[in-house]
């Protein structure tokens, strides 16, 4: 971690801070003996904030069924944790919107924030957890480090975010270029604002929940991580990987199949359309889950066709394999339909192929997508074709696959396998 850059961000005079009202509400609601009357009296001193809370409690997102006209009624109906969430969310949202730069796509940032917040609420409801408001706020604010880094670095950070094809690619690019990620900055800000640990931990570790050891914080972080991937399904320009990851993570966390995940994502899209106006966030009214999944499947079908063409155009050559063991994820290409991503154990790699072990068999000729990182942290997406699937002496499935082609990243044509330097670039990426 680059401590100098972190200190530079921490000491930035234009970095947004929590207003006095929000700080006091946070302090009051963390006390075991606080009085709702004190919170109501405090909020009444900020008419704009009170108005937003009343508008929210009367919205279809909360669906109370009757009109609430006073802050006291809203507090009783919503509860202290929900009010805390709204006060902090509205306060920071308002402050952060005041500082705008031309280098950073803040509209996409806020769209992702409200999609993730909605998803976290729905996930908590399915898990019957009482930490719904905590997860909602953590998901809403988990990427706040991006805004802080943009405030300090300006055009430099805008160029970094532009290199990420998906939000999931961003931490590797940030770490490689800056020595610091937006998640680490979010953790620093959460600590500086004296957020409870239940908020701090998910905000800091939402890209690496496996690093959290304690069970409850780990569970909350996994919820926020899944919520973020659900948001990427709607926000990423190419949602294929986000969709595959969301399905895999939903199966692991919620024990739901693809149909159950599809229902969750459809509801995320519908409910976010209700939440977004409350935070003054504009979302495309034509963006719905049915459209997203159709586009993702069309992209996968296109990839399969490109792979078939490339297979006939290049001569396969053997390349030296290097032993390399690590857990990775692949995306099977099955009939042009996006499925969940699958974790496999990478065993060896070369410029022309990979070997791995898996729990489920693959047929000869089956294709899959594997994404690795270049030296600068940006992704390289590769299409492979299975050439063998055998059981070893221990009964473990050992699978070998040959590289078919490098896939287009959507910004420039993909290099051909027979082009000069391509094999070397692939070797560096997969062996990194």
Regions found by a protein language model. Give the residues of each.
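Short beta-strand-centered aromatic/proline hotspots
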Residues: 344, 382-389
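Short, solvent-exposed secondary-structure boundary/capping segments
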Residues: 355-358, 390-404
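Conserved alpha-helical "signature site"
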Residues: 1-241
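Divalent metal-dependent phosphate-bond-processing catalytic cores, especially two-metal-ion Mg2+/Mn2+ enzymes
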Residues: 189-201, 220-314
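Short conserved beta-strand and strand-loop elements enriched in small hydrophobics
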Residues: 326-335, 365-380
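N-terminal helix initiation/capping motif
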Residues: 1-2, 14-18, 273-349, 402-406, ...
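Extended Gly/Ser/Thr-rich low-complexity repeat segments
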Residues: 365-375, 411-424
């Amino acid at each position: 971690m680059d401590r100098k850059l972190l200190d530079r961000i921490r000491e930035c005079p234009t970095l947004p801070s929590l207003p006095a009202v929000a700080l006091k509400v946070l302090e009051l609601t963390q006390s075991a003996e606080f009085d709702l009357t004190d919170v109501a009296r405090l909020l009444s001193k900020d008419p704009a904030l009170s108005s937003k809370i009343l508008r929210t409690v009367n919205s279809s997102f909360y669906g109370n069924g009757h009109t609430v006209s006073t802050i006291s009624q809203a507090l009783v109906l919503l509860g202290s944790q929900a009010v805390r969430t709204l006060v902090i969310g509205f306060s920071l949202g308002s402050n952060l919107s005041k500082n705008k730069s031309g280098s950073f796509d803040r509209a996409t940032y806020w769209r992702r924030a409200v999609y993730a917040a909605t998803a976290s609420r729905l996930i908590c409801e399915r898990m019957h957890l009482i930490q719904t408001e905590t997860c909602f706020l953590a998901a809403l604010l988990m990427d706040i480090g991006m805004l802080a880094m943009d405030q300090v670095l300006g055009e430099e950070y805008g160029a970094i975010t532009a290199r990420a094809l998906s939000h999931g690619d961003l931490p590797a690019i940030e770490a490689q270029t800056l020595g610091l990620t937006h998640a680490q900055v979010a953790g620093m800000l959460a600590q500086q604002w004296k957020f409870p640990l239940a908020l701090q931990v998910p905000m800091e570790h939402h890209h690496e929940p496996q690093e959290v050891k304690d069970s409850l914080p780990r569970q909350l972080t996994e919820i926020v991580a899944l919520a973020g991937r659900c948001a990427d399904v709607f926000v990423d320009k190419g949602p294929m990987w986000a969709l595959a990851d969301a399905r895999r993570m939903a199966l692991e966390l919620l024990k739901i199949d693809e149909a159950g995940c599809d229902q969750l994502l459809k509801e995320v899209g519908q409910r976010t359309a209700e939440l977004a106006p409350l935070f003054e966030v504009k979302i495309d009214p034509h963006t719905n889950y049915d459209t997203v999944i159709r586009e993702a499947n069309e992209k996968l079908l296109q990839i399969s066709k490109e792979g078939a063409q490339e297979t006939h155009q290049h001569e396969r050559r053997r390349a030296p394999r290097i032993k390399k063991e690590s857990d990775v994820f692949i995306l099977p290409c099955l009939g042009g339909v996006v499925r969940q991503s699958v974790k496999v154990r990478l065993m060896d790699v070369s410029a022309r192929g990979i070997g791995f072990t898996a729990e489920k068999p693959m047929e000869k000729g089956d294709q899959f997508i594997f994404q690795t990182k270049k030296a600068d942290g940006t992704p390289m997406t590769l299409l492979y074709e299975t050439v063998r699937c055998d059981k070893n002496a221990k009964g473990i499935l050992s699978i070998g696959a040959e590289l078919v082609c490098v896939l287009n990243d959507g910004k420039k044509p993909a290099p051909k396998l027979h082009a000069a330097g391509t094999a070397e670039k692939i070797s560096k990426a997969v062996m990194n």
